[in-house]
Regions:
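Conserved glycine-rich cofactor-binding loop
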Residues: 43
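Rossmann-fold scaffold of SDR-type NAD(P)-dependent oxidoreductases
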Residues: 40, 110-118, 143, 168-170, ...
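Conserved active-site helix of classical SDR/Rossmann-fold NAD(P)-dependent CH-OH oxidoreductases
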Residues: 52, 148, 193-201, 205, ...
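N-terminal Rossmann-fold NAD(P) dinucleotide-binding loop
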Residues: 47-48
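Conserved glycine-rich Rossmann-like NAD(P)H-binding loop of the short-chain dehydrogenase/reductase
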Residues: 57-73
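Catalytic loop of short-chain dehydrogenase/reductase
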Residues: 119-120, 127-140, 145, 155, ...
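C-terminal helical subdomain
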Residues: 209, 216-219, 224, 228-269
Length: 269
């Protein structure tokens, strides 16, 4: 085998077996390309940590939240990353605003659309016999309908990027298999995530032929305001987000519709 053939063999091996795993890192660090992510709910908790870690990786971040003027930590980050961090107002239940922002960013490719915004609804509001159905509507609006609307509005931006990923922060609480083992709880939150998962699977099937990967990642029980009061052992946000970013890097068109736990294992439906 001559040298050219050897080089070709090595290139193909790396592309087929190593490339998908490290494609995001290679594109951002070795090719000079600067990827962009748009993150919802970026002012605190997991969304804020996503913002920090993607900025540290050299990405451009469009951080969205309902009240940017009150997002002190985001605004402090802006001072350190003036050229890489944009902070924009967005509430995922406001579909008109989603459309406005999509139009405003029409010339901006978005490599990873990161649907992070979510609410639990509060455990006391979803107890059988005393359920607050207005709260249920709110949970569905944020956790289920919001990510679908975001995906539809920002599809052109993702399509025009290099990495082409639509990622949603889901939960193992959306797994019917796990619910059967864990028992009844969190009616609103669980069902919102189960419905979200089905939407994202449908979206993955719809967009696979267009080269767009769709995936769901689970942070596990994480020590944030979102999880306050829940009787679970908690993981630090820094660790949870680092795990999810690693899993996002591994989601490609080949394994689109992936439903991935923080440890990299597939969550049963």
């Amino acid at each position: 085998m001559n040298n050219l053939s050897k080089l070709l063999t090595v290139f193909l091996t790396v592309t087929l077996f190593v490339g998908p795993m490290f494609s995001d890192q290679l594109r951002s660090e070795e090719t000079g390309y600067t990827p962009t992510t748009l993150i919802t709910g970026a002012n605190r908790g997991i969304g804020l940590e996503f913002t920090k870690q993607y900025l540290e990786k050299g990405w451009k971040v469009i951080a969205t939240c309902r009240n940017p003027n009150r997002a002190d930590e985001l605004n402090n980050l802006k001072q350190n990353y003036p050229d890489h961090l944009s902070i924009m107002q967005l509430d995922v239940i406001d579909h008109n605003r989603i459309d406005e922002l999509a139009l405003q960013l029409s010339d901006t490719p978005i490599d990873v659309l990161l649907n992070n915004a979510g609410i639990s609804g509060g455990s006391s509001k979803q107890i059988f016999g005393t359920m607050d159905y207005k709260v249920y509507e709110d949970v569905l609006a944020v956790n289920t309908i919001g990510p679908m609307k975001m995906a539809e509005a920002f599809y052109p931006h993702v399509k025009n990027s290099q990495l082409k990923k639509i990622i949603t922060v889901s939960s193992s609480e959306g797994s019917i298999d796990k619910a059967l083992k864990r028992g009844a709880r969190l009616f609103f939150y669980r069902s919102s995530k189960t419905a979200l998962n089905m939407l994202m699977v449908n979206l993955a099937l719809q967009l696979k032929s267009r080269g767009i990967a769709v995936g769901m990642v689970n942070p596990g029980a994480t020590d944030t305001d979102f999880m306050t009061g829940l009787p679970f052992p908690m993981r630090p946000p820094e660790v949870a987000v680092a795990d999810m970013i690693r899993n996002i890097e591994n989601i490609t068109v080949d394994n689109t519709a992936a439903y991935v736990n923080y440890n990299g294992k597939t969550i049963p439906w």
